[in-house]
Regions:
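N-terminal signal peptide c-region/cleavage motif recognized by signal peptidases
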Residues: 17-19
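Extracytosolic ligand-binding ectodomains
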Residues: 2, 9, 22-388
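Sec-dependent signal peptide hydrophobic core
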Residues: 5-15
Length: 388
């Protein structure tokens, strides 16, 4: 074969490789562009800020160590204000203008559901969203990857156990009137079937509500002694706080959405007794093991405040991405990344998160979950993992 023919073949191969790289948006020779949508100025801004900080910490660590196969991460974060309409606009900007490779740790159920069609149209992965809705892995889509057992399963699994332990006469529900709250409601209804019970009363509130007097009054009037909460931060605090003022003290049972130190920090002693499902444990620094204290000190040095469990969610999302992208190798395309995820196992971490396992048919990492309760102003784990 002539030298000129060798040269032509080499040139053609280089063009082909360049074309493949060019077709994978968000990936260049020295950079990977990731996008995230958080609530930075709405009702869940406390969560969104923490998730963002956790992501930034892990991104900085990775970049300081040379990146992923020689590529640094550039993280772009947009504010949804916890509004699905804003989430669509943010997704359009990140996907179509900023050309992100993947959407990572997007906060909110309705917000993810609104944004995913924009992403999937451009072959952009939805990676480790910060919501436990089933829609994060159902119906199956090759670009969906979730790591939190769904709200539906959390309530369906633990509510019968709560009933058997507390022996309530009337189980009721207060829930946010959107996809998140409906998942909690469905889980409660299904879980009660296992103990031959039904909800005696149920009532909803609009996203962003601040007054829960009428909802609590309905619970009290129906003599509800176990109340399932499809609530997040201020709705949880508002509901329980209102109940305490009325001298109404049922057992309150929430989901992982209410598992945050903000509940007892902002709600005070009235929040004692609240149960919530969870996986990753909140890092209380005065009782944490040395690896967590070391990590928390790095966090505090960078942001001048203590981390919380949502900081961990953000940190872990980037860490899992880095594991998968690193194993994918230098030829980082969406298809190659998905193939890596199809066989990825992530071991349990220093925060007590369960092992995650993915496969070509399995787009959720784990169904494992456990239960915590606020006791003496802090969350205490009160059950072992189930569904492992």
């Amino acid at each position: 074969m002539s030298t000129s023919r060798h040269t032509l073949i080499a040139f053609a191969l280089s063009l082909s490789a360049g074309a493949v790289l060019a077709q994978t948006q968000g990936v260049s020779k020295d950079e990977i562009v990731l996008g995230s949508i958080q609530d930075l100025s709405g009702p869940l801004a406390g969560f969104g800020k923490s998730v963002r900080q956790g992501m930034v910490l892990r991104v900085d660590e990775i970049n300081e160590q040379g990146g992923i196969n020689g590529r640094k991460i550039r993280l772009l974060v947009e504010d949804s204000k916890y509004d699905p309409r804003n989430a669509v606009l943010a997704a359009q900007k990140l996907v179509n203008q900023e050309k992100i490779f993947a959407m990572i740790a997007h906060l909110g159920t309705a917000q993810n559901m609104a944004a995913m069609p924009v992403q999937f149209q451009k072959n952009v992965v939805n990676f480790m969203p910060v919501t436990a809705a089933r829609e994060m892995y159902e119906p199956f889509h090759k670009l969906k990857f979730a790591n939190i057992g769904p709200y539906y399963e959390q309530v369906r699994t633990f509510l019968p156990r709560m009933v058997q332990e507390k022996k309530p006469k009337a189980v009721c529900a207060i829930y946010q009137d959107d996809e998140f709250g409906l998942e909690v409601l469905r889980g409660a209804e299904e879980g009660l079937k296992a103990v031959n019970m039904t909800l005696v009363e149920k009532t909803s509130f609009k996203r962003g509500a601040t007054d829960f007097a009428s909802q609590v009054a309905r619970m009290k009037a129906a003599n509800c002694d176990l109340v399932v909460l499809g609530t997040i931060i201020r709705e949880t605090i508002g509901t329980i706080g209102t109940a305490r003022k009325l001298d109404y003290n049922p057992t309150f049972f929430g989901t992982q959405a209410a598992y945050t130190d903000l509940i007892h920090k902002l709600g005070g002693p009235a929040m004692n007794g609240l149960y919530a499902t969870m996986t990753t444990q909140h890092p209380y620094l005065d009782e944490a093991a040395q690896p967590i204290r070391f990590w928390a000190n790095k966090f505090k040095t960078k942001f001048n405040e203590d981390p919380n469990v949502f900081s961990v969610y953000g940190y872990n999302a980037i860490d899992i991405f880095a594991r998968a992208a690193g194993r994918t190798g230098a030829n980082l395309t969406t298809d190659n990344f998905v193939k890596t995820m199809d066989s990825l196992t992530v071991p349990s971490d220093i925060f007590g998160s369960p092992e995650l396992r993915f496969s070509p048919q399995r787009r959720y990492g784990s169904m494992a979950m456990r239960l915590s309760q606020i006791q003496d102003g802090r969350w205490k784990v009160v059950s072992d993992y189930v569904n492992q």
